[in-house]
Amino acid sequence: MRLFRSLTLLLASLLMTVAAPAAFADDTYQVEMILVRQNAVPAIVSRAAPEDWAAGAQRLGNDSQRTPALNDVVTKLTASGEYTVLMHKAWQQSLGEAPAKVAVSEGQEQFGQFPIEGTLEMKLGRFTDVTADFWVNQIDANGLVTASEHLRQDSHTKNGQLNYLDNGHLALLIKITSLTAPAPREAPEVVPD
């Protein structure tokens, strides 16, 4: 009896050891974001963006960028006249329980600064924790940032859904979709009795 119990405990601990790394392994996700200006809200000009705006963040490489899927949302936002779409990007990256921070930018770089620049930090859990930190910069003829609009927002987002992060004058729409999770099964046409 003791031998059987010992073997059972040994087998259970072995299975937990083998299965545990898979439970905490990073998965591949597609991240898509749309940064907008809300036209009806007065601009809030903040201090100029810091020179080290991307500190600690991984830059998006061309190989990770993907074709955006939310073009219909961009069309509706633009047609409404209530929003100005400033940036629309999509990329693929690994996400897990450890925070992953990426640097995202748009426009011509001048002395390390972009017209639109910022970081997204994401961490998987029950929800995906997102910290968005973006600047929309006014750059003068000498390449110096003279003024910035700033969006800083923390949110718990649901994967696979379009999430709206409101920060007054600027807002961010973000959708994080797993590329490795199994697709949901279709509901049967007829439910058996």
Give each language-model segment a name.
Residues 24-156, 160-165, 179, 185:
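Extended, low-hydrophobicity segments enriched in charged/polar residues
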